[in-house]
Amino acid sequence: MSKLFVGSEIGQLRRVILHRPERALSHLTPTNCHNLLFDDVLSVEKALHEHDQFVATLRQQDVEVLLLQDLLEETLAHPEAKQWLLRHQISHYRFGPTFANQIRAFLLEKNNKELASILLGGLAFIELPFKAPSMLQQLSDPFDFVIDPLPNHLFTRDTSCWIYGGVSINPMAKAARKRESNHLRAIYKWHPLFSNQSFPRYFGDENRHYDNATIEGGDVLIIGKGNVLVGISERTTPQGIENLAKQLFRTEQAKQVIAIKLPENRSCMHLDTVMTHMDHNVFSVYPRVIDKNMPCWSITPCGDQQLAIQEKPNFEHSLMQALELDSLNIITTGGDSYEAEREQWHDANNVLTIKPGVVVAYERNVYTNEKYDKAGITVLPIMGDELGRGRGGARCMSCPIERDGI
């Protein structure tokens, strides 16, 4: 049996979870897209074609691709998993007691494929075949959603992240994404691929309100050698990082967490939108945000499950020290000032490394890809004119569950 383990950002990628969000994207409109954290509506047909190409590119590199909807459908075959998900998704507090019971009964009549599609892609009031004694139903527009679509499930990196020998099921920052975590909780507990293996769940797998302790996988880079690099961003808080660090140290899966502060704006919502690891000493960086002389924080274990937190004056030096390197090769976003800003917006720095020196990147970022090529990095180009409008690149759209260390 293959081992669930992610030991780096650059070691051979072996297995990964992706999501092809057809139903959810078809429910995006100009009216609701901003509430669902998209800047615009996407062409569904083109986006799915681009995603299929992404899947094919990974499989051509001998990466096993698991699709989230398939995993959820297979998880729902377990009766306890189905009951647990519906109890958490369709609560009396969200819908009122009578209406919630009738929605659950309606959904239990669906086969597992249909139910997975609804949970991921949404359900409108007009699709309900019954009228409940419910003020909520009576006051709602027929085309309002009973169950909101989850188009951001496209970005499987964020909802859970495998860090060395375990997983963090992340408490998400935005209301539009919070339901995503329950799908991964169910999959990791009941799907036979995971239920037959033992691994620590660092964070996010309890029935509790995590308050301000949010964390998203786009901010988490497993840089190797027992180190984890995390961005403090609009989505990931210091409280989230410290709670994650405590569990990493308790389970002896990591020896240091390095944290850096990012601006809180949409263009760099996660660390991996401005920085990714491409080869042993090679990083892609957007220089307007990531500077080698910026401060960072080193978090290490300190007896009796306490944390030692020390501010460091030089990020580059801390990174080299963690990776046991004498120097770093920093490749900055390509083009002039205007071109670099445009390409960063379209995820030029958000690449998925397949193995050292080989990355998947959007083909549209020609200036940055040219710099990668000149630096000896092999770029496997994929289309991203539609997918990129969701504000995520190849790394954002992938959740590695098996990758070699360095």
UniProtKB/Swiss-Prot annotation:
Reactions it catalyzes: L-arginine + H2O = L-citrulline + NH4(+)
Residue stretches spanning the membrane: none
One GO CC term on file: cytoplasm
Protein EC: 3.5.3.6
Active site: 396
InterPro entries: Arg_deiminase
GO biological process, one term: arginine catabolic process to ornithine
Subcellular location: Cytoplasm
Pathway where it operates: Amino-acid degradation; L-arginine degradation via ADI pathway; carbamoyl phosphate from L-arginine: step 1/2
Keyword Cytoplasm: yes
Keywords: Arginine metabolism, Cytoplasm, Hydrolase
Molecular functions (GO terms): arginine deiminase activity
PANTHER family, alphabetized: ARGININE DEIMINASE (PTHR47271:SF2)
Family per record: Belongs to the arginine deiminase family.
Name assigned to this protein: Arginine deiminase
Gene source species: Aliivibrio salmonicida (strain LFI1238) (Vibrio salmonicida (strain LFI1238))
Organism ancestry: Bacteria, Pseudomonadati, Pseudomonadota, Gammaproteobacteria, Vibrionales
Gene of this entry: arcA
